[in-house]
Amino acid sequence: MKTIGLFYAMNAAKTSHIAEKIREDLGGVKVIEVVLIEKAWQNDFQAYDNMIVGASTWFDGELPTYWDELLPELRTMKLKGKKVAIFGLGDQIRYPENFADGIGLLAEVFEEDEATLVGFTSSEGYTFERSKALRGEQWCGLVVDLDNQSEQAE
């Protein structure tokens, strides 16, 4: 079994791009196994002690439908002892009132499931009004704004 499960949606082009970049940077197929959200089940989340999960933020701060369909199932799991790092995409210019909320929504679910969130990053350098992804002055994951700060994704 691989040591890290990387969960994201294949049909979300920007999220897929960032997920593949993360996978390459962390050691590729020897270390990370991809689990596509469109095909994921509860036991997929139970299979890994370390997970990286990714999602974009849609519309008014919502998770994409492929995550929404899994949320009821995810809310019933207990993930105590498992570590979860979250990454997500947002657009701080077009959606400053709910920038990268998808990360925060996922974080809430994994926190309820008693997982340990890792990978907090600085919110410095971003311009926005509100975000559910903020914990104090930090993001509860890696925030990527490919539309306005694409150079930071490299």
Per-segment meaning from a language model:
Residues 39-44:
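Short acidic active-site motifs
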Residues 12-13:
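Glycine-rich NAD(P) Rossmann-fold beta1-alpha1 loop
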Residues 4-9:
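Short, hydrophobic/glycine-enriched beta-strand segments
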Residues 3, 17, 25, 29, ...:
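FMN-binding flavodoxin-like domain, especially the glycine-rich phosphate-binding loop
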